[in-house]
């Protein structure tokens, strides 16, 4: 790959004109085959690779020849016959070809990222991560509206090809990409006019498509947001609308400061903050309700005009921050803004000023979490723990690990919230549901299970704030930690309860717009 990168660095025009021949280099597919064996072609390591023992580069070369013919006869996604190229998920040949296509397409973007301007959104071919908790504590106190937007992942393959065409001038290099996309769209599993591009697909090829698609969406959106946030502050009288504002500002009559002290305002552009997690994004806005409606309309119109996508109105949901419970990143988060008074005093002039700021005060939404636990059959509607019958076929360690994983995720996320007393009720429900599940599996009672397995087994799984116990706090630091909030970013995976809640919210919003 270093040779390919040096090849593209020599001359930008050469890189644009001679990208297509790289698809037919056997060395490229040898590299892609090594990536496939190492498990780097997916977000999770491959476990069973026995079919790769008889891997033949001659077969790959024949497959490359079929791509060269441009007759759409290659079989990468269609599951038919005993053809070794049939199953995309199991065939090493198909994975190697897709890996090779991805490596070639990543070349111009990786070169571009090295020369990107500092502070701009850099390209990541198959990795994208955003900071969530600093965003909440820094931006939420200065916002009063939240928009939860879902990125549309059903897109026509030709739109993806055209977005690549804006950067890659070598048109023949996009023919194999177009062939693969159309073949995937016409496969029996995806008989529709669009293809589904989601970050949950493990293959490197679809992760590359997803991140490039999101990169295109965010690059234009970021430029508009930065243009809005870096505008100069000007003196003006209040206008009903901002249409042709720069033209109107020239006709303002400048009065003396003594006469116009009360009538001249400072223009402060609305503060718009953006963060994305997966296929969902949060836009925090400080402004009026009319501004929020305009931003929502702009997002829908932007997707419709730029990507030729019809986005349903419920994909962009806005609500007031202080009155509703938001979901970030897939968890519940209810925010309460507490006024924080800060008094400053100048010693020389004896000047005292009182500053009022909003404090980010997240609280644990116990009622929605109990509703999730009831929906997932951990408890009933009243909050009484019940056994998880669908997990009785698992081993004891798997059952304990699953319950422990749910509790650790919830505790890690809400460890920085005030009023964590409700978490102990959730802990009680999960621990008792775990005990009832084990008792149902062994066809005994909770008392017998506790007697056989021992109470220390439950204490090991549901330890009380073991994350805090592992920190070397002194006595003063321990007392201070009880007053301050400590955020834990060690969330290994999204809580499985979140998917259930997200489906409920989506159905409610869709039904609201259908009425």
Curated annotation (Swiss-Prot):
GO terms for cellular component: chloroplast. One of its GO terms (biological process) is mRNA processing. Signal peptide: none annotated. Pfam families: Intron_maturas2 (PF01348), MatK_N (PF01824). Keywords: Chloroplast, mRNA processing, Plastid, RNA-binding, tRNA processing. One of its GO terms (molecular function) is RNA binding. It comes from the Eukaryota. It is found in: Plastid, Chloroplast. InterPro entries: Domain_X, Maturase_MatK, Maturase_MatK_N. Usually encoded in the trnK tRNA gene intron. Probably assists in splicing its own and other chloroplast group II introns. This is Maturase K. The lineage of its organism: Eukaryota, Viridiplantae, Streptophyta, Embryophyta, Tracheophyta.
């Amino acid at each position: 790959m270093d040779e390919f990168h040096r090849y593209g660095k020599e001359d930008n025009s050469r890189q644009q004109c001679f990208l297509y021949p790289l698809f037919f280099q056997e060395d490229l597919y040898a590299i892609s085959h090594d990536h496939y064996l190492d498990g780097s072609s997916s977000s999770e390591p491959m476990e069973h690779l026995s079919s790769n023992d008889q891997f033949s580069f001659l077969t790959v070369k024949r497959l490359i020849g079929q791509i060269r013919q441009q007759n759409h006869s290659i079989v990468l996604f269609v599951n038919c016959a005993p053809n070794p190229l049939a199953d995309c998920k199991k065939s090493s040949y198909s994975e190697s070809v897709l890996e090779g296509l991805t490596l070639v397409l990543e070349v111009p973007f990786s070169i571009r990222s090295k020369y990107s301007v500092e502070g701009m959104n850099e390209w990541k071919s198959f990795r994208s991560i955003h900071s969530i908790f600093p965003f909440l504590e820094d931006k939420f106190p200065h916002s009063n509206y939240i928009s939860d937007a879902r990125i549309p992942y059903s897109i026509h393959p030709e739109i993806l090809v055209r977005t690549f065409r804006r950067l890659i001038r070598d048109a023949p290099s996009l023919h194999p990409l177009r062939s693969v996309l159309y073949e995937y769209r016409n496969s029996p599993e995806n008989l529709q006019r669009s293809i589904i591009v989601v970050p949950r697909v493990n293959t490197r090829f679809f992760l590359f498509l997803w991140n490039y698609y999101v990169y295109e969406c965010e690059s234009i959106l970021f430029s508009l947001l930065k243009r809005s946030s870096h505008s100069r502050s000007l003196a003006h009288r209040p206008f009903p609308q901002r249409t042709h504002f720069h033209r109107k500002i020239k006709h303002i009559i400048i009065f003396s400061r003594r006469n116009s002290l009360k009538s001249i305002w400072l223009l402060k552009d609305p503060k718009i903050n953006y963060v994305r997690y997966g296929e969902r994004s949060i836009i925090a806005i400080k402004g009026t309700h009319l501004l929020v409606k305009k931003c929502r309309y702009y997002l829908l119109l932007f997707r419709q005009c730029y990507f030729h996508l019809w986005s349903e109105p419920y994909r962009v949901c806005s609500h007031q921050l202080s009155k509703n419970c938001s979901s970030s990143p897939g968890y519940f988060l209810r925010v309460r803004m507490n006024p924080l008074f800060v008094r400053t005093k100048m010693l020389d002039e004896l000047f005292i000023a009182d500053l009022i700021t909003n404090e980010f005060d997240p609280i644990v939404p116990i009622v929605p979490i109990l509703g999730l636990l009831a929906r997932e059959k951990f408890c009933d509607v009243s909050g009484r723990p019940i056994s998880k019958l669908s997990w009785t076929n698992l081993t004891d360690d798997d059952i304990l690990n699953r319950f422990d994983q749910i509790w650790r995720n919830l505790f890690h996320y809400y460890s920085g919230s005030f009023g964590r007393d409700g978490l102990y009720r959730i802990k009680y429900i999960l621990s008792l549901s775990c005990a009832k599940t084990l008792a149902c599996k062994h066809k005994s009672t909770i008392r017998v299970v506790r007697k056989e397995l021992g109470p220390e087994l439950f204490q090991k799984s549901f330890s009380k704030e073991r994350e805090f116990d592992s920190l070397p706090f002194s006595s003063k630091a321990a007392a201070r930690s009880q007053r301050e909030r400590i955020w834990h970013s060690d969330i290994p995976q999204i809580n499985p309860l979140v998917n259930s809640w997200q489906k409920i919210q989506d159905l409610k919003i869709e039904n609201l717009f259908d009425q």
